[in-house]
Amino acid sequence: WQHGSPLILNIAPLEGALDMVREAGIDAIRKKSLAMTGYFMELIDEKLAKLGVEILTPREDDRRGGHVTILHVAASEITDFLDSGSRITDELKSAVREKMASGKPAGKDDQVRISFSPLYFSFEDVYMTAQNLEQLLGD
């Protein structure tokens, strides 16, 4: 069955979340989002570009949303790594090394989209994400 309107009990929990958005203000949320994605791109340039990470997201604030899309030959392993809470296993590290050593360039399917919710992520979380990716992709 399809409904034209959601059930009220299904949307009731949204009230608390929307209160947080109203309290923070959408302009402040957008400003922090841009600052976080800008900072993450700086960290990629500093720590991850030398490991084959390429930024696909536009760098201009007015052309960028709240995420950074990267291109890397080991994109599927990066996704698994981030989904696992940044746990590095021998198997994962081996798969990353194998793909990086293959010499195969990253293709259009080798993209990872990374976002940080400005309502509850901190700049330390952004830094730790870059550091964890550096540990995964580095020697």
Question: Which residue ranges define each predicted feature?
Answer:
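Short, contiguous acidic/charged loop-to-helix segments that flank catalytic cores in large enzymes
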Residues: W1, D27, V68-T69, S117-F121
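A short glycine-threonine-serine/GTX helix/turn-capping micro-motif
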Residues: W1-I8
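Conserved PLP-dependent catalytic core of the aminotransferase class-I/II
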Residues: L9-L56
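Conserved PLP-binding catalytic core of the aspartate aminotransferase-like
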Residues: L34-G38, D45-S86, A95
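PLP-dependent enzyme catalytic core of the Aspartate aminotransferase-like
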Residues: F81-R87, S94-D139
